[in-house]
Design a protein with these regions (language model features):
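Non-catalytic cap/lid and distal C-terminal segments of serine-dependent acyl enzymes
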Residues: 1-163
Length: 163
């Protein structure tokens, strides 16, 4: 988990400032990913909403407890969006930032998507209970957990985001 936290530190302290310098200081960023990348993308926007304002997460797992087995500490908690978002208070300063963000989640319901479907259902309930608006899109039973579908989803949602 320490290496994972160092990855966050690199993104926030080195990568974003370097790109901002070259791109005339754009303040907010979109984060996206598929499968484990969607998990990381969601974790980034919910942990650091001052830096990110748009999320496109395709086929992610948002309750990461299954990755840790019996091991739990502060880092596993802060890398489990279902855990910390369920417990965030409604008056937390981040709540307003979440409400101003575009949050898009998509999952197919075909082969290899069942855990992702269950995870998104669980997470969408948490977001609803926290009064955070998110577009949670469940695609058909022919839509499986793989790159050909993520390419289709990415093209579709990018058009929606940049309308």
């Amino acid at each position: 988990m320490l290496k994972h936290e160092l990855w966050f530190e690199y993104i926030l302290s080195e990568l974003i400032p370097s790109v901002q310098e070259k791109m005339n200081n754009y303040d907010k960023w979109m984060v996206t990913g598929a499968s484990l990348g969607a998990t990381h993308a969601a974790n980034l926007i919910f942990r650091f909403p001052k830096q990110f304002d748009t999320l496109l997460a395709l086929s992610g797992i948002y309750d990461t407890e299954l990755f840790y087995g019996d091991y739990h500490d502060e880092n596993t908690y802060h890398n489990n969006p279902c855990a910390y978002m369920k417990n965030i208070s409604l008056d937390h300063p981040y709540m307003e930032l979440y409400k101003q963000s575009k949050l898009i989640f998509c999952v197919g319901q075909g082969n290899w998507e069942q855990e992702c479907v269950e995870s998104l259902r669980q997470f969408s309930t948490i977001l609803y209970d926290q009064h955070i608006e998110a577009w949670c899109d469940f695609w058909g039973y022919d839509v499986y957990h793989d790159w050909p579908w993520w390419k289709v989803q990415l093209q579709y949602f990018m058009e929606q985001i940049f309308k």
